[in-house]
Amino acid sequence: MQAMVARERRVVLARRVITRCSDAVGEDFDGVTAAEFQSLKEAGEFALSWEAHGLHYAIPMAVNTHLQAGRDVLANLSRTTLIHAKDRFARFEVINLTAERGVLAARLAARGRETAQQIAGRLDRATAHLPEGIEPLHLDNSGPLGQTVQAALDRLYPVKA
């Protein structure tokens, strides 16, 4: 996702709010406690929120500022919230990144955030179907990152003749 943002000026990355310790490796996010998350949610600070993997996740309302400025917002969402996102945002595209099971297992293990059992659960869920009504761009991310990024950008921003 960061590679797409680096290559395309029209794209910004949504910074998620997660009930995870802020010093966890991986994505850049705002870590909050469950109580803080609930307070923010009740105050209307989230455009979207959901639960997955034993955590609470949200996309802050700040995404509206980017959308109103004509930028596209790239966000890492759960399958469980895609229909809500489609209903919430006028223009909504889903990029469904997949990778070979061995490649995905190695990437998840390298993050160091989950146990082997949790990784196995993620691998099993990786093949789950998307909700009805979602028509994604399917991309295999098993190979070079640059190739995947270019394929996504070509689909999102086709060259007009």
Predicted segments with their positions:
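A conserved segment at the C-terminal end of the G1
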Residues: 1-9
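Short glycine-/polar-rich loops that comprise or flank the Walker A/P-loop
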Residues: 9-11, 88-93, 132-135
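Conserved beta-strand scaffold positions in the cores of enzyme catalytic domains, especially
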Residues: 13, 31, 49, 74, ...
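ATP-dependent small-molecule kinase phosphotransfer cores
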Residues: 17-73, 77-79
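Conserved nucleotide-binding/hydrolysis micro-motifs of P-loop NTPases
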Residues: 18-22, 80-81, 98-104, 144-145
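Conserved catalytic network of the ASCE P-loop NTPase/AAA+ motor domain
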Residues: 65-68, 86-89, 130-132
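Conserved phosphate-donor/acceptor-positioning beta-strand/loop module used by diverse small-molecule
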Residues: 73-78, 87-111, 126, 139
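NTP-dependent small-molecule kinase module
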Residues: 106, 110-114, 128-161
